[in-house]
Amino acid sequence: YVTNVLQSDSLIQIPAYYRILLFLPWDHSFAHTVGLYSFMYNGASLASVDYGQSGMEYLRNIPVNLQEVKPHILLSVPALAKNFRKNIEAGIKAKGRFTDKFYQLGLKMAYSYNGFGDDRGRGWKVLLKPLVKLWDILLFSKLRKQVFGGNLRFFVGGGALLDIELQRYYAALGIPMFQGYGLSEASPVISSNTPARYRFGSSGILVKPMDLKVCDEEGRELPQGQKGELWIRGGNVM
């Protein structure tokens, strides 16, 4: 775990003033490395959701604790991310047709401006920047405060493949969800997108130091672009 914390820090540096609210199981290596140890290593603060007397009470406590902690980073899995979106859009629709149309138009512009992530605001997209900024001031910043406390910078997603549409959606809200890739046996982080470099649908860039190659069934290394089995070597491998 110590090695993987140092490797993860090569991708995303966590300022000491950052806070995280952990609502993923603590017995998972993803929560251990990225949620607990990385924050401890950087002197940042962490909080957990009030468990309550049942699973349902635990889920009801999440929105309450988000407002109390006002986290800067959240760890998520696709099911939770979809549930957040469902609740956000239900709240928008409850405010009436005009608000919903305004919201949908803002999403459409942000999708165009963000592109695939790594081409955000480039070329003709720069013309959309004033409108994207306006919609952020009028709507999306308020949603971030109302739902997540107002300080959230980004999510780190793991546990399963993140739908590209879900990544586009949260980027449009101003809180991108960075997909990563890992294995429990690798402690678990192997790669991740980062605030400085991300692309929707990609699993990001490798942690450092770590060796990686793609091999065929016989263990022969394959050239770039070929599909095969992922082999890694590093101090994070159990």
What are these model-derived regions, one by one?
Residues Y1-V2, Y37, G55, A171, ...:
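Generic secondary-structure boundary signal with a strong preference for alpha-helix termini
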Residues V2-R19, F23-F140:
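Conserved AMP-binding/adenylation subdomain of ANL enzymes
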Residues Y111, L128-M238:
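Conserved AMP-binding/adenylate-forming
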